[in-house]
Curated annotation (Swiss-Prot):
It comes from Drosophila simulans (Fruit fly). GO terms for biological process: Bolwig's organ morphogenesis; cell-cell signaling; cytoneme assembly; epithelial cell migration, open tracheal system; genital disc anterior/posterior pattern formation; germ cell migration; glial cell migration; gonadal mesoderm development. Keywords: Autocatalytic cleavage, Calcium, Cell membrane, Cytoplasm, Developmental protein, Hydrolase, Lipoprotein, Membrane, Metal-binding, Morphogen, Nucleus, Palmitate, Protease, Segmentation polarity protein, Signal, Transferase. Ca(2+) 1 binds at E147, E148, D153, T183, E184. The record marks G255, C256 as: Cleavage. A lipid is attached at G255 (Cholesterol glycine ester). It is found in: Nucleus; Cytoplasm. It is an enzyme of class 3 (hydrolase). This is Protein hedgehog. Residues 26-43 have a biased composition (Low complexity). GO terms for molecular function: calcium ion binding; cholesterol-protein transferase activity; morphogen activity; patched binding; peptidase activity.
Amino acid sequence: MDNHSSVPWASAASVTCLSLDAKCHSSSSSCSSKSTASSISASPETQTMRHIAHTQRCLSRLTSLVALLLIVLPMMFSPAHSCGPGRGLGRHRARNLYPLVLKQTIPNLSEYTNSASGPLEGVIRRDSPKFKDLVPNYNRDILFRDEEGTGADRLMSKRCKEKLNVLAYSVMNEWPGIRLLVTESWDEDYHHGQESLHYEGRAVTIATSDRDQSKYGMLARLAVEAGFDWVSYVSRRHIYCSVKSDSSISSHVHGCFTPESTALLESGVRKPLGELSIGDRVLSMTANGQGVYSEVILFMDRNLEQMQNFVQLHTDGGAVLTVTPAHLVSVWQPESQKLTFVFADRIEESTFFLLRDGQSGGGGEKQVQQNGIHWYANALYKVKDYVLPQSWRHD
């Protein structure tokens, strides 16, 4: 017994054998069996083993329950249409990436068109009010040449910083041990002619840390995939990239409706969204176009003070719909008799969209600016580019 007492598992095994053997005894040895059982129950080693066995059974049941939930929960959810995500981490990476060729640009348009990086907004100097909108980039995965010694090459617009950080990650994945090199970003010395997005912090010239020119075609492709709005394989020595201004795309990140926009409650009362409360049941729509009342359970991103750009859609019946450019609008296609969803800023004249009173209409579109409310958290915009198809995103 001394040996058994020094080895817990051996002692427990002996007790278990005694317990099983006691069950096989006749009633004439019941007293000795009971005394053995009492000594067994009093053994701390036995209690420990029973506790371990019970814990293992509980863990096994918990694992089975979790596995069951993982199978059942996806069946309980159904897809829903929501506002289009705006700025994010870039575009879906294609399976086969082809490098750009020298002098190629993507898109094949003028850099200053709205479909590319957009028009110039004005030079930003250190004493300009907009200078505070530039942000420094201290990403350790990016090398900055900073030949001026002023840190100017680290300054850029918020959107440019986002895309550059994504590109830096892609470069490390494509060529382990190689880092992204920024040779020029915001420029205050007017080295780029009279018109350049470098003066606004919206453009960068880039290369790889090893200066291997054979990589630059693929580097340009990675920049396109990272989400830069205009990429040019402008020279054998570097790649040029630029982005839209932060002001032109801010409405894609915040806002959905104005605080004055109203929601129809189940009671029949119209309530401004700025006064909407958790628990209110508002009119919404199912996937097949049926109106249902749904409970408001959460405001994940609500800002009643921030100014944003909105689109106003006017119908021939006099109705006005005010939403952000990336908001999805229910559009009716008479030719195919189908209901689709289109981003608000892509709706054209004579388009039919659904209104609550059953009327449909189409009309002009104009931009307005005021405060807005958004239903979704910013975190969703950080992951949307990796989970949504390109056609679903509002860039």
